């Protein structure tokens, strides 16, 4: 925690400097590699961690070394992780998927925006200073066409996006030759299908079955294809966004870039303050990962924050606005039904979802059914025209462990299952949002209920938090639950930062939340037995046993913190080659002792072997050459 708190002006200036001087940056001793596919333009980025060799013998003057293989890892940082790419936030990222979208021939450019709100914003000269300069000309599906990845998958089409994902999910593990690195414990997958090698056909089949989604709006061509499904790597989402109280456009762009650097697979823009439209445009044009939103937040801003004044027309206009900007998935709270609201009256903490409480208030004030539920088919028609995935929101999720797994929570979940089938009628991709606050012994039921009632659509949960006693540490309390539910089959985990329940997260909070959740996701992949998940762990363990300190730092999820902690007590360069750390010192290091025991045992084996040979030699009479019949 910083010693001095920056003023708002200083925070904005710092963020502006960050994005003005932004360059592609690699992690220490890592380099960007690309693996190409068969489709034109399929060039999948990964980070390769370079390792130092292992000392295996020789003399001080002529040591002998054995090379250690470089470790390829999944990389969400996009162009920001490649030092060879020139970054210009004012211009945005290259449109990676544009040629693929155009080649399909099923979209058309819009000469006029569909949203009245967008038209008004574009006509307002007073916003010119805030506006992203290179506004994208939006596309939509041609009349009678659907442009979703689910639509293509159901027709047996393997898209470039699917091939890109197959290569990405394999994480370059085919490059690893060492048996030590390839060793992996069997997992317990709870019914997940985890093939040894992920093919583009497997990706297509999972999407076609609705078990996985590829969030990829045709108006967000800058994004690198990724997949969310329980038969793939567990993903992590980071939330950013301004509020009426704090944050600015430059700070949100900074948080976006920061999030992708630290492993966010998707980012949700939850802005509720001024200039939501303009902020989102900057984020989308500079995001290599899918962007999600909760459209009801902006719709509420359009009616001056009065939930009772919300209308379907205002909400529909917001969907069109965001779809044409390029939002990849919408959280829609269509399962908060009028008859479910009284079920929350017995709760300790009531309705804690912002979207859920907005819709509950609207339903009660009008005594009408949720207009998102009533107009759900129209929502699906919009999504099908732009390939916006639906994240069906858990507006009645528990906000305390006392309220976990109650009647209201599961009633809504069952409704989300009904809505999933409707969305699939329109070839719209769907995932299901989940809790919340759930003690450990009650977590697995959430997964089994979701699989059964939501037809194996991907599950996307906030945590869950396993205890309510640790404000300031809720990234820990929720990371425990996230690891568990990820193991049970949850496809994506929404991070929680140390500021949860306390305030809007800053850059450092975003990093802490992401590191915690990358640990949880990776632990879940290990427990499930995801092929190749253990390679990095094995490389780290080998480096640790061999006292290759630099490699230990570089293999870490956060190399900078690992190095800083080591250097607090052993800052000298000699500490980077020492066969001990400050925890135990040179005399009591268990790994150093283990090495000595191993070397001693090997020497003893040789000595015993030599003694046996000597005894055998004497027993045969001490002759140098044996007679032929004795040999």
UniProtKB/Swiss-Prot annotation:
It catalyses: 5-amino-1-(5-phospho-beta-D-ribosyl)imidazole + S-adenosyl-L-methionine = 4-amino-2-methyl-5-(phosphooxymethyl)pyrimidine + CO + 5'-deoxyadenosine + formate + L-methionine + 3 H(+). [4Fe-4S] cluster binds at residues 581, 584, 589. The keyword Cell cycle does not apply. Pfam families: ThiC-associated (PF13667), ThiC_Rad_SAM (PF01964). Its EC number is 4.1.99.17. It comes from the Bacteria. The keyword Iron applies. One of its GO terms (molecular function) is zinc ion binding. GO terms for cellular component: cytosol. Keywords: 4Fe-4S, Iron, Iron-sulfur, Lyase, Metal-binding, S-adenosyl-L-methionine, Thiamine biosynthesis, Zinc. Its cofactor is [4Fe-4S] cluster. Pathway: Cofactor biosynthesis; thiamine diphosphate biosynthesis. Zn(2+) binds at residues 437, 501. InterPro entries: ThiC, ThiC-associated_dom, ThiC/Bza_core_dom, ThiC/BzaA/B. It is an enzyme of class 4 (lyase). GO terms for biological process: thiamine biosynthetic process; thiamine diphosphate biosynthetic process. Substrate binds at residues 239, 268, 297, 333, 353-355, 394-397, 433, 460. Binds 1 [4Fe-4S] cluster per subunit. The cluster is coordinated with 3 cysteines and an exchangeable S-adenosyl-L-methionine. Homodimer. HAMAP family: ThiC (MF_00089). Belongs to the ThiC family. Catalyzes the synthesis of the hydroxymethylpyrimidine phosphate (HMP-P) moiety of thiamine from aminoimidazole ribotide (AIR) in a radical S-adenosyl-L-methionine (SAM)-dependent reaction. This is Phosphomethylpyrimidine synthase.
């Amino acid at each position: 925690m910083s010693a001095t708190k920056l003023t708002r002006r200083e925070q904005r200036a710092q963020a502006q400097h960050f994005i003005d001087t932004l360059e592609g940056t690699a992690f220490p001793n890592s380099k960007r590699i690309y693996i190409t596919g068969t489709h034109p333009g399929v060039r999948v980025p990964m980070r390769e961690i370079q390792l130092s060799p292992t000392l295996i013998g020789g003399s001080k003057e002529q040591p002998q070394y054995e090379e250690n293989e470089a470790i390829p890892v999944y990389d969400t940082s996009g162009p920001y992780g490649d030092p060879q790419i020139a970054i210009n936030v004012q211009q945005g990222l290259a449109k990676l998927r544009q040629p693929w979208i155009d080649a399909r021939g099923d979209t058309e450019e819009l000469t006029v925006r569909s949203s009245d709100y967008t038209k008004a914003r574009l006509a307002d000269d007073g916003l010119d200073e805030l506006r992203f300069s290179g506004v994208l000309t939006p596309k939509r599906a041609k009349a009678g066409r659907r442009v979703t990845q689910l639509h293509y998958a159901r027709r047996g089409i393997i898209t470039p996006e699917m091939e890109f994902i197959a290569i990405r999910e394999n994480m370059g593990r085919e490059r690893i030759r060492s048996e030590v690195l390839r060793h992996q414990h069997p997992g317990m997958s709870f019914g997940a299908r985890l093939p040894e090698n992920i093919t583009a056909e497997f990706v297509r089949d999972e999407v076609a079955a609705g078990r996985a989604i590829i969030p990829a709006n045709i108006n967000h061509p800058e994004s690198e294809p990724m997949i969310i499904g329980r038969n793939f790597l567990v993903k992590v989402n980071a939330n950013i966004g301004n509020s009426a109280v704090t944050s600015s456009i430059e700070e949100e762009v900074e948080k976006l870039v920061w999030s992708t650097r630290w492993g966010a697979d998707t980012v949700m823009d939850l802005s509720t303050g001024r200039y939501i439209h303009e902020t989102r445009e900057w984020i989308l044009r500079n995001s290599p990962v899918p962007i999600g939103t909760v459209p009801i937040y902006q719709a509420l801003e359009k009616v001056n924050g009065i939930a009772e004044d919300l209308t379907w027309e205002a909400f529909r206009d917001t969907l069109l606005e965001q779809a044409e900007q390029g939002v990849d998935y919408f959280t829609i709270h269509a399962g908060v039904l009028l008859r479910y609201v009284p079920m929350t009256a017995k709760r300790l903490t009531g309705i804690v979802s912002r979207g859920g409480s907005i819709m509950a208030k609207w339903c009660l004030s009008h005594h009408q059914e949720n207009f998102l539920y009533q107009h759900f088919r129209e929502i699906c028609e919009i999504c099908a025209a732009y390939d916006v995935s639906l994240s069906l929101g858990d507006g009645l999720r528990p906000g305390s462990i006392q309220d976990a797994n109650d009647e209201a929570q599961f009633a809504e979940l069952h409704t989300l299952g009904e809505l999933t089938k409707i969305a699939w009628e329109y070839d719209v991709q769907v995932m299901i949002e989940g809790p919340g606050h759930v003690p450990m012994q009650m977590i697995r039921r959430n997964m089994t209920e979701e699989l059964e009632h939501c037809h194996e659509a991907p599950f996307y949960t906030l945590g869950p938090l396993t205890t309510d006693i640790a404000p300031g540490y809720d990234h820990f309390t929720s990371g425990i639950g996230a690891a568990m539910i990820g193991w049970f089959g949850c496809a994506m985990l929404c991070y929680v930062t140390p500021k949860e329940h306390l305030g809007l997260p800053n850059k450092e909070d975003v990093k802490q939340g992401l590191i915690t959740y990358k640990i949880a996701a990776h632990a879940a992949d290990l427990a499930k037995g995801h092929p190749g998940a253990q390679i990095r762990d094995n490389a780290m363990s080998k480096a640790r046993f061999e006292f290759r300190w630099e490699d230990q730092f570089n293999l870490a999820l956060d190399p900078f913190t690992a190095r800083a902690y080591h250097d607090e007590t052993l800052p000298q360069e000699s500490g980077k080659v020492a066969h001990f750390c400050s925890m135990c010192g040179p005399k009591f290091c268990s790994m150093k002792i283990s090495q000595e025991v191993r070397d001693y045992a090997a020497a003893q084996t040789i000595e015993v072997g030599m003694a046996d040979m000597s005894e055998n030699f004497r027993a045969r009479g001490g002759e140098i050459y044996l007679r032929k019949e004795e040999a």
